[in-house]
Amino acid sequence: KVVTALVPDAFNSKSARVVIVFGEKHDLLWDEIYNAFEGKLAREKVDSFKAGAGTVLFLYDEETVNNLQEKFSDYADNFPVWANQANGMLQLAVWSALRELKVGASLQHYNPVIDERVKELFDIPSQYKLVAQMPFGGIVSEPDPKDEEDIEQRVSIVR
């Protein structure tokens, strides 16, 4: 809750929504994700997420975004982009907070295939748009090191 409250967003919109799923509901979520893809996902991969302690569902309120688009029409095209950017910042903040607590996590994107089923399972309002799923739990292993790259290709410093 603290992390969600602290992450900024454009126009102080507070469009981000978080649902944290534990226990049998967490298991059901991952079984439903597997079923939604009709065997196209590796069962072992889905079971690795299911083995976690829980899952954070990241969403944003499209009604909030629509209201801002109407109120500030000059920026209308930007509000969905800004909602996703704010959601990304929230995802990183939650992931970092979990890591500080020595809890492992990964970020998954099985939407839009699972969107409607997730809303049904957890009584999520229809105007909420699912963005990502973050299963979390014990740290099984450290992530593989990232490939070396020429960071100068991605970062420019102008003086």
Q: Where in this protein do the model-derived segments appear?
A:
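N-terminal amphipathic, basic helical "cap/leader" segment at the start of enzyme domains
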Residues: 1-55, 158-159
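Beta-hairpin (beta-strand-turn-beta-strand) motif
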Residues: 23, 59-63
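Short, surface-exposed loop/helix-turn segments at secondary-structure junctions
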Residues: 32-37, 70-79, 122
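Active-site-flanking beta-strand signature of metal-NTP-handling nucleotidyl enzymes
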Residues: 55-59, 134
